[in-house]
Amino acid sequence: DEWSGDAGGGNWIVMQMYRKVYENLILKDVNTPLVMEYVKAMNLGSKVDFINSWSDLKDGENTECKVLHRKIIQLFFELLERSNPEVQALANQMIKCAAYTIDAAVRELHFFGEKIPVYLSGSILTKAASSGYLSMLKEALSCICQGKLEVHMCAKRPVEGAVQLLKG
């Protein structure tokens, strides 16, 4: 979210990846490993192709746009697993945001107890994220929340968990 600084959703990843490539390829005229991998994955032949790809990426709901978004998100997590420093910086921003958001929710909802169960959900966490990213997130949560949380991956849709919680 542009206002709150919330980082980590699929659109956010796509925009940040595009911005990093734009910064390096267009503004600095530098072919970093991220630029080379992005251009290859997106099948772009020139700087003009890259700039023109923006309209395909921002188109939102059409099938081609969704395919391109998935491709960039997959590339993001692949590069993270290969320790790409530019992607690592973005992942750190995402992790920090997620960990502080979860900590704030625990505090605001007045959850108490020795161990508070937290179920991670959302398509990025449950479908796209790499095991390395999830480990980094769990480690950040452990530090920020001082080990109070018992972190699990949501195996079902989040709404099913909410209904189950209400039923008791």
Model regions and ranges:
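ATP-binding/phosphotransfer module of carbohydrate and carboxylate kinases, centering on a glycine-rich
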Residues: 18-168
